[in-house]
Amino acid sequence: MSNESIFEPPAWDERYSGEGKIWSGNPNAQLVAEAADLAPGTALDVGCGEGGDVIWLARRGWTVTGADFSAAGLARAARNAEEAGVAERTDWWQVDARSFDAGGRAFDLVTSQYLHPPEGGMVDVVRRLAAAVAPGGHLLVVGHAPPSGPSHDSGHHTNAQRHAMFLATDLLPGLPEDFEPLVVEQRPHPVTRNGKTMEIDDSTLLARRRP
């Protein structure tokens, strides 16, 4: 993918149309940490990819909508949900987060994991996602923080990808006034690539919409 194409649907359609899994299929760590104790309800996962988080939520009793701008990714996610036996608890929505409009729909949990629109666009995405959170519901946004040192994962991403990274505090301007931030922090965790262990910081924002 070129630096520009990584942010557009055709590049991801091509990637998801290939052989083999792109992602592990395991739920993302911060989703597990923050959603495991929430009472199941309705959830929206924006940027759902192959559906790993959707499947995890559905297995825990949630009714989940997986949203992504890649039709090929959504097709994979639907197949994975069918194989996991949770198809009846899931549905799929092709939409670009940069132009996302909830259209009056509201969810008890809205989550987005590692979605990185270019040029600081994540603040506007947070604003759009917040509009889809029901009163009393939660918004969880997780992404890559900019590398903070030589031991962090600075070489795995392109310049364009690094410029799209954010800190949790960067996202606060996107929260409407009726949201209460509960978690605003970077959470380091080790990863191993090519036999080398390094740290990645997860920028984690959890907020609750007041009833």
Regions found by a protein language model. Give the residues of each.
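Conserved SAM-binding strand-loop segment of SAM-dependent methyltransferases
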Residues: G85-A97
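Conserved class I S-adenosyl-L-methionine
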Residues: M1-L38, P147
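Conserved beta-strand signature within the Rossmann-like core of class I S-adenosyl-L-methionine
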Residues: G136-H144
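Short alpha-helix
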Residues: R162-E185
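A short SAM/SAH-binding and catalytic strip from SAM-dependent methyltransferases
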Residues: D108-M122
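A short glycine-rich, Lys/Arg-flanked "PGG" loop and its adjoining helix->strand segment in the class I
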Residues: V123-P135
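A short acidic, Gly/Pro-enriched loop at the edge of an enzyme's catalytic core
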Residues: R98, A102-L109
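Conserved SAM/SAH-binding beta-strand->alpha-helix loop
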Residues: S70-A72
